[in-house]
C-alpha cells in the first residue's frame, strides 16, 4: 500500500500509513481501536468486526483499507457514551451476553437497524440481520430481547451482584 490513506474514524481525521490486509487490521493494529474483534478474518463469517462505513453496517475484515479513503468509519468507541451504556444495561439485564466477544459487532448492527427503523424495529425484523453474527455462548433470544429493549426505549434495571467469594451469584 503506497502512501497514506486518510479517512474519518469516530469523528476524527485519521491516516493509515502501514500495510494492512484489511480495515480490521488497520483499526486494531495501527489505530488501537479494539472493539472490532477478529473472530474469523478474512472470511467475514462471524460479524465480530462489524463497523459502520458511511453509516452502513459492514464487516471490517472484508474491507480493503484503500476502499475506505475519504470515508466515515464508526466503531463502538465512536457511539455516544449514553448509547453504549443503554446497550450495556440492556444486554446485562436481559442476559444477552456471556463472554462478550461478539457483542461489539452485534451492537453496531443493532445501532444501524435502530437508526433506520427506530422504535418500529421488531425482533422479527431484527432476527435476520443477526444471521451475519455468530454467538457461540448465549444464543440469540436474549440478544434479541436486549436489542428490542433498546429500540423501544424500555427501561431496564441492570442486575446488581452483592456477593463475595464462595457466595451464590445471581443467575439471569
Please annotate each region the language model reported.
Residues 1-172:
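Signature of N-terminal electron-transfer/Fe-S-associated modules in redox systems
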Amino acid at each position: 500500500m503506497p502512501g497514506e490513506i486518510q479517512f474519518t474514524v469516530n469523528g476524527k481525521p485519521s491516516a493509515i500509513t502501514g500495510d494492512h490486509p484489511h480495515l480490521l487490521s488497520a483499526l486494531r493494529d495501527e489505530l488501537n481501536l479494539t472493539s472490532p474483534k477478529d473472530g474469523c478474518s478474512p472470511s467475514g463469517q462471524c460479524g465480530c468486526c462489524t463497523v459502520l462505513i458511511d453509516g452502513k453496517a459492514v464487516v471490517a475484515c472484508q474491507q480493503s483499507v484503500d476502499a475506505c479513503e475519504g470515508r466515515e468509519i464508526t466503531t463502538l468507541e465512536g457511539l455516544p457514551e449514553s448509547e453504549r451504556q443503554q446497550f450495556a444495561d440492556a444486554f446485562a439485564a436481559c442476559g444477552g451476553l456471556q463472554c462478550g466477544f461478539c457483542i461489539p459487532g452485534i451492537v453496531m448492527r443493532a445501532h444501524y437497524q435502530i437508526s433506520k427503523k427506530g422504535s418500529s424495529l421488531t425482533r422479527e425484523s431484527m432476527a435476520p440481520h443477526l444471521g451475519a453474527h455468530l454467538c457461540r455462548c448465549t444464543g440469540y433470544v436474549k440478544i434479541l430481547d436486549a436489542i428490542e429493549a433498546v429500540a423501544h426505549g424500555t427501561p431496564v434495571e441492570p442486575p446488581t451482584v452483592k456477593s463475595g467469594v464462595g457466595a451464590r451469584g445471581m443467575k439471569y
